[in-house]
Amino acid sequence: MPAIIQIITTINDRERAEKIGRRLVEEKLVACCQITGPIRSIYRWKGGIEEADEWYVIIKTKRSLYNQVEGTIRRLHPYEVPE
């Protein structure tokens, strides 16, 4: 049985979260994406403390597909440094 992992990311826009989730499922890179939110995030960025509403995305996949999933997220994610 393959090792199953969960990948978590946050995104500032529900439609973008759904677009990424849909692409990952369509490309058969993941079994499931769950999107919840909005959540409130407080974080340090470029020397300051920021706050933002975000959408929480839980991604379920095989460990062997992690690099492909990460690459797709990086290509489609709006953040300079996707979490």
Label every model-predicted segment.
Residues 1-83:
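Positively charged, small/polar-rich N-terminal and surface patches that mediate targeting and assembly
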